[in-house]
């Protein structure tokens, strides 16, 4: 069972001043509206309704936090989250790319999103959700360029890969890796950017994404320790 299955709603904020003062690592999910961000979060957390997608793309301009740890697994549990036991946060950022919002709302969203990804110290990495059929729009590039100067990792999940044939999938991943490799720091060293294919329908790429997210949150060692402990316990019972 993945640690991500422990995810449960923690809080929603509309201003930077309202961000939680927790000190655990955060990993943020960003992406164009309708790229499959909510679906990816729900599948990775093994919960159908953890993250809701707005019926009107581009309408949700809040930042939603989901805690890992501090409570029993599953949204149906009514027990209170123990903040001191939270180990990490999944952060759902507003989807971007639609014009159905007013100019003032769009400006507020851009300021909120830009300030969060550039200044939030607790932010360990960014997961960029990109439709594999329409990879890296201008707004996706803008997000990359907002975040790159932080030097923190970006993992790109190329969704809806089931809509592509094998050659198209290979080309989409190659294109993504080539683009990401073009981002280098002042010393010419590439930023820690990675990419993978993902399909909610075919349920492919889930384990790869899960392992990468836990690695970026620094929780993969805990998973290994728990696995080793379980293996040792099973061995003792067998004896």
UniProtKB/Swiss-Prot annotation:
Function: Necessary for normal cell division and for the maintenance of normal septation.
Cofactors: Mg(2+)
Chain's gene name: engB
Keyword Cytoplasm: no
Keyword Cell cycle: yes
Superkingdom, natural source: Bacteria
Record-listed Mg(2+) binding positions: 38, 60
Similarity field: Belongs to the TRAFAC class TrmE-Era-EngA-EngB-Septin-like GTPase superfamily. EngB GTPase family.
Residues the entry annotates as binding GTP: 31-38, 58-62, 92-95, 159-162, 193-200
GO biological process: division septum assembly
Keywords from the UniProt entry: Cell cycle, Cell division, GTP-binding, Magnesium, Metal-binding, Nucleotide-binding, Septation
Organism listed in the record: Herminiimonas arsenicoxydans
Segments forming domain EngB-type G: 23-219
One GO molecular-function entry: metal ion binding
Pfam families to which the protein is assigned, alphabetical: MMR_HSR1
Cited HAMAP family: GTPase_EngB
Name the record gives this protein: Probable GTP-binding protein EngB
GO terms under cellular component: cytosol
């Amino acid at each position: 069972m993945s640690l991500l299955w422990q995810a449960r709603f923690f809080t929603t904020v509309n201003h930077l001043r309202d961000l939680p003062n927790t000190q655990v690592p955060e990993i943020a999910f960003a992406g164009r509206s309708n790229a499959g961000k909510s679906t990816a979060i729900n599948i990775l957390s093994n919960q159908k309704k953890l993250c809701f997608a707005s019926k009107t793309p581009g309408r949700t301009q809040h930042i939603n936090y989901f805690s890992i740890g501090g409570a029993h697994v599953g949204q149906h549990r009514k027990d209170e989250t123990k903040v001191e036991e939270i180990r990490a946060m999944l952060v759902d950022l507003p989807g971007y790319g639609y014009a159905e919002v007013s100019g003032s709302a769009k400006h507020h969203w851009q300021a909120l999103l830009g300030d969060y990804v550039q200044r939030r110290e607790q932010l360990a990495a960014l997961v960029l959700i990109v439709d594999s059929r329409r990879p890296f729009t201008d707004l996706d590039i803008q997000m990359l360029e907002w975040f790159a100067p932080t030097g923190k990792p970006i993992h790109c999940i190329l969704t809806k890969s089931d809509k592509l044939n094998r050659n198209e999938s290979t080309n989409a991943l190659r294109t993504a890796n080539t683009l990401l490799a073009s981002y280098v720091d002042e010393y010419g060293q590439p930023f820690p950017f990675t990419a993978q294919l993902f399909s909610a329908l075919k349920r492919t790429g889930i384990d790869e994404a899960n392992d990468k997210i836990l690695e970026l949150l620094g929780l993969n060692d805990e998973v290994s320790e728990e696995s080793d402990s379980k293996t040792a316990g099973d061995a003792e019972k067998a004896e």
